[in-house]
């Protein structure tokens, strides 16, 4: 709530309570609570993988809740429409909107679109709960195997482990750079490191390293290259900043460890065969 957010959407597989269609659960966030919506993974994936038609989708929604008010949350990547599936923004989204408009003109208002904030106002609060760690690509089998993020941080995936080790090094260096950026030169390089860190954490690099069966050396290396810039600029900021000699020495050790990890990642990318 400190950032102005009032609700969030999580994967349906992360719901630890009876499936909500007529109440909105809450999630404890520090001293306050956020409304939490759980994505209907089945219905959402039917759209994402072109397993439904606009008419089938709307007919299915019409039956939810019987005669009572109920809601369904569908969510997917925006690039699903037009990028992953050519013309899907017209063949599905546009067609679904036209069907709804036609139904409403005939006085059939059973299915309506709504913003999440409208649902928070319309439906009563449910339980305050702790969702399971999960993602939109997590299955119940993954949760049972204690693998909540199989495409991004899978147990047993050596490359994932190396990638996150490198992330830890870069985040530590960037934080140290900001903390001791007491000169104009140090502030300049600390700002560059901070600016590069956010895109450097993009999830595609881990997704393409998942081997389920996704594998793309160039996409993995693109993320590594962005993080390299974080480490480089953070190291320069620390060198020109006001840190103590001991802190600067520890930063040099951290850079050396980061270089070892980076080289290990590059060896995997150069030498290991695709799955």
Protein language model annotation of sequence segments:
Residues 49:
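Conserved NTP/Mg2+-binding pocket subregion across the NTase superfamily
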Residues 23-34, 38-41, 52-56, 62-275:
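Active-site and substrate-binding clefts of carbohydrate-active enzymes
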Residues 1-21, 26-36:
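Acidic, His- and aromatic-enriched active-site or binding-groove loops in soluble protein domains
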């Amino acid at each position: 709530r400190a950032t102005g957010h009032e609700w969030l959407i999580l994967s349906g597989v992360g719901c630890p309570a009876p499936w909500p269609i007529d109440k909105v659960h809450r999630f404890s966030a520090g001293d306050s609570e956020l409304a939490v919506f759980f994505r209907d993974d089945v219905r959402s994936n039917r759209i994402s993988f072109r397993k439904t038609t606009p008419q089938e989708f709307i007919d299915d929604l019409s039956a939810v809740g019987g005669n009572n008010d109920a809601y369904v949350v569908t969510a997917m990547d925006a690039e699903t429409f037009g990028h992953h599936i050519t013309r899907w923004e017209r063949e599905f989204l546009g067609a679904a909107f036209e069907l709804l408009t036609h139904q409403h003109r005939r006085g059939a208002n059973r299915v309506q679109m709504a913003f999440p904030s409208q649902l928070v106002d319309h439906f009563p609060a449910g339980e305050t709960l702790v969702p399971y760690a999960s993602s939109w690509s997590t299955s119940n089998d993954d949760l049972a195997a204690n693998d909540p993020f199989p495409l991004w941080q899978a147990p047993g995936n050596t490359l994932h482990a190396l990638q996150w080790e490198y992330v830890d090094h870069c985040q530590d260096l960037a934080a140290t750079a900001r903390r001791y950026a007491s000169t104009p030169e140090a502030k300049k390089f600390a700002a560059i490191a901070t600016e590069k860190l956010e895109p450097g954490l993009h999830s595609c690099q881990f997704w393409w390293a998942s081997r389920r069966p996704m594998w793309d050396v160039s996409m993995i290396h693109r993320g590594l290259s962005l993080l390299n810039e974080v480490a480089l600029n953070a190291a320069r900021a620390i060198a020109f900043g006001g840190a103590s000699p001991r802190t600067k020495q520890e930063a040099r050790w951290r850079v050396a460890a980061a270089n070892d990890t980076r080289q290990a990642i590059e060896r995997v990318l150069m030498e290991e065969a695709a799955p």
